[in-house]
C-alpha cells in the first residue's frame, strides 16, 4: 500500500524549502497580488468614468428617476467586470506561482526571478491550455454546484491538480498538444481517495489565516507562499514522479 506524507510532513517540506529564502517566496507571491490589485482599480476607475460620461449629471437625477437606475446598472456592471477580470488574473497568477514552486521543489537551489516566474503561465507555452482548464473547471464546478453545494466542492478538489499535471505533461511531451480536458480527467483519477486528505490540508491553514487577519493583513505575506507551496508539496507526494522522465530524477 502506497504511503503518503502527513500534513505536518508536507508543511515541514515547505518550510525546509523556504529556509533562508523566504524573501524569494514572498516576492514571488507579492508582485502578482499587486498587479491584480492595480488591474482591479484601473477597471473600476474606467467603469465609473464611462458611467459618468454616458449619464445625466448628478444635479438632474431628481428630474429623471431612470437616469439614476441606469447609473446603478452601469456601476454594477463595472464592478462585475472588474471582479471577473481580477478573479481570472488572480487564478492564472496562482498557477504561475505553483509552476515555480514545483520547479523549486525539484531543484532546491533554483534561482527565483519573481516577475518572470510568476508570469510564466502567460507565455505561449502555457497560457491557452491553462486558460481553458480554468474555464472548463469553472463551468463543471458551477454545474455541479447547481445540484447542491457539496457536489461542487467535491468536484473543485477533484479538478485541483489539473494545472500541475498539465505542466508536467507539457514537459514530458514538449512536441505534443496537451488536452486541457484530459488533464482535468487525469486530475479526477489522481484525486480518487485523496480529496478529503487535501481538504483537511487546506483547512489546517485556517488558524494561520485568522492570525494573518489579526496582524492587519501583514501575515498574509508569509501565509500565501506557505500555503501555495504546501499544495504543490501535496502534488509531489501524490504523484511520486509519475509524470517525470528518468533524467528528471
Describe the role of every protein-language-model region.
Residues 1-249:
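Hydrophobic alpha-helical membrane segments
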Amino acid at each position: 500500500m502506497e504511503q503518503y506524507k502527513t500534513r505536518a510532513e508536507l508543511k515541514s517540506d515547505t518550510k525546509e524549502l523556504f529556509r533562508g529564502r523566504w524573501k524569494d517566496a514572498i516576492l514571488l507571491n507579492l508582485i502578482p497580488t499587486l498587479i491584480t490589485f492595480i488591474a482591479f482599480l484601473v477597471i473600476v476607475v474606467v467603469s465609473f468614468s464611462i458611467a459618468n460620461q454616458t449619464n445625466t449629471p448628478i444635479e438632474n437625477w431628481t428630474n429623471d428617476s431612470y437616469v439614476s437606475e441606469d447609473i446603478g446598472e452601469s456601476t454594477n456592471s463595472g464592478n462585475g467586470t472588474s471582479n471577473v477580470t481580477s478573479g481570472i488574473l488572480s487564478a492564472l497568477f496562482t498557477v504561475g506561482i505553483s509552476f515555480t514552486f514545483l520547479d523549486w521543489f525539484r531543484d532546491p537551489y533554483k534561482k527565483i526571478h519573481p516577475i518572470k516566474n510568476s508570469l510564466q503561465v502567460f507565455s505561449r507555452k502555457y497560457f491557452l491550455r491553462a486558460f481553458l482548464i480554468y474555464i472548463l473547471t469553472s463551468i463543471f464546478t458551477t454545474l455541479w454546484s447547481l445540484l447542491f453545494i457539496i457536489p461542487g466542492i467535491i468536484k473543485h478538489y477533484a479538478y485541483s491538480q489539473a494545472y500541475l499535471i498539465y505542466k508536467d505533461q507539457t514537459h514530458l511531451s514538449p512536441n505534443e498538444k496537451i488536452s486541457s480536458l484530459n488533464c482535468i480527467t487525469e486530475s479526477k483519477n489522481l484525486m480518487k481517495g485523496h480529496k478529503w486528505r487535501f481538504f483537511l490540508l487546506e483547512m489546517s491553514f485556517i488558524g494561520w489565516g485568522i492570525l494573518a487577519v489579526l496582524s492587519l493583513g501583514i501575515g498574509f505575506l508569509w501565509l500565501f507562499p506557505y500555503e501555495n507551496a504546501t499544495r504543490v508539496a501535496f502534488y509531489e507526494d501524490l504523484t511520486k514522479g509519475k509524470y517525470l522522465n528518468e533524467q528528471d530524477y
